[in-house]
Design a protein with these regions (language model features):
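Small-residue-enriched alpha-helical segments and adjacent helix-cap loops
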Residues: 2-13, 29-170, 175-180, 184, ...
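Intrinsically disordered, low-complexity polar/charged tails and linkers
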Residues: 7-26, 227-229
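Short, solvent-exposed coil/turn linker segments
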Residues: 78, 178-181, 201-209, 213, ...
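Terminal amphipathic helices with adjacent charged low-complexity linkers/tails
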Residues: 81, 198-227
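Flexible helix-coil linker/hinge segments at domain or subdomain boundaries
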Residues: 97-101, 194-203, 372-379
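Phosphate/diphosphate-binding glycine-rich loops and adjacent basic-rich segments that engage nucleotide
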Residues: 161, 167-170, 219-236
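Internal alpha/beta scaffold segment
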Residues: 173-201
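Glycine-rich, small/acidic residue-mixed loop/short-helix segments
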Residues: 351-379
Length: 379
């Protein structure tokens, strides 16, 4: 357990309005502050899960969201509630020492991690904490050394994967890798990114640098990835999906009592060692449930930038989405709820909804200014 950051009444708290909140740097939204928690190694025990559930109810509006970066975030936190929330979570080793350490510890770990992967993630976290690398807020690492990578489609800039004979280090956007001798190699690749101008203006991603034709030394073929699994039984336990990635506090408590939890970037939780999960509010265990085809941000009024309500609309359209397809309903053109292309995207505008086919929320629309009543006819 680390020492809790000392936040006192009247202390200045850095509040951001962009896409990258933290626990120590919350984000202002339409329903209050958003506080994002990064569980160490992507793991939660029952006490930690209970503390998060308690904090959501005591200091927020009770909403807990699973993010696409395998974190959790609490919504509806009032400014006066932030300090006691941080203190409560610090008692369970869920808070970093300061904002800089929190920002650097952006590590995505495969939920199917074994002891080797856990040790790698811990060593990488320690090396990042000891470094002074001025990495952009979204710059992240993926520890994915299983027999087959499962995180290749998920956000990371530097990836640790397994080749035929040894661990590999790969820059995102390149299909060639280099041997990994230690986590110091991962930090060296991050320094290379900075030295090559990848973070001009304090922003930047590895894939964007690679797209400019700047590439690190790498000659080994990267392993072929597999798509992420759906909810249900896996060798390590049970994967539990949540509608729109939102987990009710008591569901989080109950799941954690059934086994240690592993975070995923797929808005699911892995309950380690479980062979059966009882029905719980918000839980989706059927891999063909139509709600799994939906992506939607919180929408209005939770987000001040959203121009329409999103999730009830998405639910009403779920049965119209073919199996294997994705419908994304976005409250604005930023597309926070799903940064990827979707088979159909509905983007709210001041004139109604725009329909984008096989694209993202800000892409050119096939139809514009649609009323919600028109949507079932055009999907």
């Amino acid at each position: 357990m680390g020492d809790a950051p000392q936040l006192h009444r009247g202390d200045a708290v850095s509040v951001v309005k962009g896409w990258c909140p933290g626990a120590l740097q919350p984000m202002q939204s339409g329903d209050g502050w958003v506080v994002r928690i990064r569980p160490r190694g992507g793991r939660l025990d029952a006490a930690q899960a209970g503390a998060i559930a308690d904090a959501a109810e005591a200091h927020g509006n009770g909403v807990i969201e699973l993010t696409g970066r395998a974190n959790l975030q609490l919504r509806g936190v009032a400014p006066a509630a932030h300090a006691p929330l941080v203190a409560a979570l610090s008692a369970h080793a869920l808070i970093d020492a300061d904002i800089a350490a929190e920002t650097r510890r952006n590590i995505l770990v495969t939920p199917f991690a074994d002891a080797e992967a856990d040790a790698l993630a811990e060593a990488l976290a320690g090396a990042l904490a000891a470094s002074d690398l001025p990495l952009p807020a979204k710059f992240g690492f993926a520890v994915d050394p299983g027999r087959v990578p499962v995180l290749a489609r998920d956000p990371a800039d530097i990836r640790i994967e397994r080749g035929r004979e040894a661990l590999l280090l790969r820059a995102d956007g390149v299909n060639l890798a280099a041997p990994l001798r230690s986590v110091d190699d991962a930090l060296a690749l991050a320094r290379w990114f900075l030295d090559m101008g990848g973070a001009a203006g304090g922003r930047g991603r590895m894939a964007a640098l690679i797209a400019r034709g700047i590439r690190p030394d790498a000659a080994l073929p990267a392993p072929a990835p597999m798509p992420p699994p759906g909810p249900g039984a896996v060798p390590q336990g049970m994967l539990a999906a949540m509608e729109f990635g939102q987990v009710p506090p008591d569901t989080l408590r109950r799941l954690a009592r059934l086994g240690p939890l592993r975070m995923t970037p797929w808005r699911m939780l892995l309950v380690r060692g479980a062979r059966h999960l009882p029905a719980m509010p918000g839980l989706i265990l059927d891999p063909i449930d139509p709600r799994l085809r939906l992506r939607a941000c919180p929408g209005a009024p939770a987000c001040p930038q959203a121009l329409a309500e999103t999730r009830n609309l998405a639910r009403s359209l779920a049965e119209l989405v073919p199996p294997g397809a994705v419908l994304h309903v976005s409250g604005c053109a930023k597309g926070c709820g799903w940064p990827h292309a979707a088979d159909r995207t509905l983007t709210a505008t001041t004139e109604g909804f725009d329909l984008i086919c096989h694209g993202r929320a800000a892409d050119p629309a096939a139809l514009r200014g649609l009323h919600p009543d028109q949507l079932p006819k055009v999907l």
